[in-house]
Regions:
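A short beta-strand-turn-helix
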Residues: 2-30, 221-248
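Conserved redox-active cysteine motifs that mediate thiol-disulfide chemistry
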Residues: 28, 34-54, 252-269
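Structural microenvironment flanking redox-active thiols in thiol-disulfide oxidoreductases
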Residues: 46-81, 97-98, 264-298, 314-315
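Thioredoxin-like thiol-disulfide oxidoreductase module
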Residues: 71-111, 119, 288-323
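Non-catalytic, surface beta->alpha helical segment in thiol-disulfide oxidoreductase systems
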Residues: 92, 104-148, 321-361
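Short cysteine-rich clusters marking metal-coordination/redox-active sites
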Residues: 166-169, 181-183, 191, 377-380, ...
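Canonical RING-type zinc finger of E3 ubiquitin-protein ligases
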Residues: 173-184, 384-395
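Cys/His-rich, Zn2+-coordinating zinc-finger modules
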Residues: 189-214, 387, 399-425
Length: 425
């Protein structure tokens, strides 16, 4: 009843699909794979899942199966995408059932892998994450009626790493102290129990708890040195806050990001201009680039020091893996003066840098000045929206600036409250 009477499966040639009775799934654990060809994360995940599924097929064929639930926009996209998959599929024409399944399992974001027991009970809605963390082991444990991930109640003062799993015991969310490797190619995360049991090829560091205030020495403990802009010359990390520095800006950006490439030269010009009048303010670059060549080419365009590419993981996690470009301003004691440094610079220009150079906060922006980072007006296309923002709940991802709101809209609009300094937009 959940999936209807018939599903699709590839015939022996693999070039076409035949219809089969849904009854063939009786007694099996079934994973519903919500995915779409237009979605890059889906196109990245599907071949990995397909490879694991094929490897496990002989062992699990009587216990486990996957059904593709398409979020594609047309039949031809569905047909093309389904050819990459070795499992069954809900017919594309059954759009009503897609809507029902999507609502029932709250599958709003793709890819999603919802694993159901033979009786239809949900085993896990974190199938994608479990496969990413444990590969074939996830598929092997689901037919036992178990989710790979588990957790426990946090004790007083323990931090909950909501979207992180221990790569040894699979505790997710990971509770308490978290250790990991700063190398980009390593995704290891260890809880305090598994840390002593692990022999990792690279040194491990302890992650810092977001929103807790640390000294600059503690924040940069995992950074062995800083790089000068146009060379491989190394500078001691502590020089960043020495010589009466009142505040530092941590600048997250990447060469592949076009808003970053627009923001960086403007910020660099202001920074060079401010060095005489605001010597108490410094910036350090934390790269979100994916390779050394891009990293080195991009930092050469900047007049400030840089954190090495393989020493940035702790800072990124402390600031919640920020959208880029982002500029966080910290005072000399490690407290945050601004989480919105980039909009502050857009609003106040060099005065922002001078204020931070005195170790002071900028006054909060007036409603008509507030910049809604990464929000575009769907009326006049202002990007980002500056001033009051209105949202249409009926349309979903639909926002208007104050000028366009006055022109009217077919559905009711809600004024979005201006976030405080520590609030998320």
């Amino acid at each position: 009843e959940l999936l209807g009477e018939q599903l699709l499966q590839h015939n022996e040639s693999g070039n076409d699909s035949d219809k089969m009775s849904t009854d063939q799934l009786n007694g099996k654990t079934v994973a519903l794979y919500f995915s779409a060809h237009w979605c890059p994360p889906c196109r990245d995940f599907t071949p990995k899942l397909a490879e694991i599924f094929k490897e496990s097929h002989n062992e699990l064929k009587d216990k486990f199966d996957i059904v593709f639930i398409s979020y594609d926009n047309d039949q031809s996209s569905f047909d093309k995408y389904y050819k990459e998959m070795p499992w069954k599929a809900l017919p594309y024409s059954d759009r009503d059932r897609l809507k029902t399944l999507s609502e029932k399992f709250n599958a709003k974001i793709v890819p999603a892998l919802i694993v159901l027991s033979p009786t239809g009970d949900k085993i896990t809605s974190n199938g994608v994450e479990e496969v990413r963390v444990a590969s074939k082991k996830a598929l092997e444990i689901w037919p036992q009626g178990k989710s790979l991930f588990w957790s426990r109640e946090p004790r007083e003062g323990e931090y909950v790493w909501q979207y992180t799993a221990c790569t040894v015991c699979y505790m997710r969310p990971l509770i308490g102290s978290r250790h990991g490797c700063t190398h980009q190619e390593c995704s290891i995360a260890l809880c305090e129990t598994c840390l002593p049991k692990n022999n990792h090829e690279h040194p491990l560091v302890e992650y810092l708890m977001p929103k807790r205030t640390y000294s600059l020495e503690a924040l940069f403990k995992s950074v062995p040195y800083l790089l000068n802009p146009k060379s491989e010359e190394k500078t001691e990390t502590k020089t960043l806050w020495q010589n009466d520095v009142k505040s530092i800006g941590i600048y997250f950006c990447a060469h592949w990001c076009s808003p970053c490439r627009d923001s960086t030269p403007k910020l660099a010009e202001l920074y060079k201009e401010a060095q005489e009048s605001a010597p108490g303010f410094r910036i350090v670059f934390v790269s979100c680039d994916r390779d050394e060549e891009s990293f080195n080419n991009y930092r050469a365009e900047m007049p400030w020091l840089t954190v090495p590419l393989n020493a940035s993981a702790v800072l990124k996690e402390y600031f919640w893996d920020p959208d880029i470009p982002s500029l966080y301003i910290l005072s000399s004691d490690g407290s945050i003066l601004s989480r919105r440094g980039r909009p502050d610079v857009s609003r106040k220009g060099i005065e922002a840098l001078k204020t931070w150079g005195r170790g002071e906060k900028l006054p909060a922006p007036l409603p008509e000045e507030y910049e809604w980072s990464y929000v575009r007006c769907d009326g006049c296309k202002m990007d980002p929206v500056i001033g009051q923002r209105y949202h249409c709940e009926t349309c979903g991802n639909y926002d208007l600036c104050s000028a366009c709101e006055k022109k009217g809209h077919e559905h009711p609009l809600e004024l979005v409250p201006q976030p405080g300094e520590d609030d998320e937009e």
